[in-house]
Amino acid sequence: VILKADMPNTFHKTGGKNMNAIQLTSRFNPQLEVSVFQGHFATRHSHNSHYIDITRMKHEFTMAREAAMTLAQNYAYDKGVDTIVCLDGSEVIGAFLARHLAKKEVFSVNSNKNINVVTPEYDSNGQLIFRDNLTPMIVGREVLILISTVNSGKSARRTLECVQYYGGKVQGIAAIFSMLEQVDGIPVYSLFSPDDIAGYISSSPKECPMCRAGQKIDALANSFGLSML
């Protein structure tokens, strides 16, 4: 992993304090970069010492293509994939991932497949569901879950349970960043991990060492991005 301090990115706080980022390069592909901010960040399920900004990877053509190509190497030759379930706005990566998995190659188990790319919906109770028009792409299918970030694993686990409820067989979980190597026995392959970020801490809100030390929360984070406080 390469940290580049000479490529700053900045978030401006309401109180006048700026937060500068360092650029983190993936050890699996030098073309893949994310911006990493240090501070006190709160998500729905966890408090984290760093915020990994993966906006470019989800929305830039070249970066999304490179991310998909790198992730595809984990599934191309021994994991059948009929459907990719995309979370957190990862549909662009998902489309490229389907393309790379379906490439015509001698040893690829997914060669020339017409792979589906779908996104689940949240109902009024916050439960993940698939509408009737999408369920044929899940029922009895081999499914790969694509998620931007795995911290506590709760979102990945909910998606896993949802796919299994609809009769899908989860083959794996692909992520841009993951704290975990597996969720309920399903392996997680990621482009970045906590080992790439010195001092990275992720904990439940009740056990957050930064809260206990009286450190104020810098920003709220979710799959759409960051809101500075």
Regions found by a protein language model. Name each.
Residues V1-N18:
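Short, Lys/Arg-enriched N-terminal segments with co-localized hydrophobic residues
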Residues G15-G80, S223-L229:
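Active-site-facing substrate-recognition patch
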Residues K17-F28, L160-L229:
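PRPP-dependent phosphoribosyltransferase catalytic core
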Residues G80-S90:
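Short glycine-rich phosphate-binding loop at a beta-alpha junction
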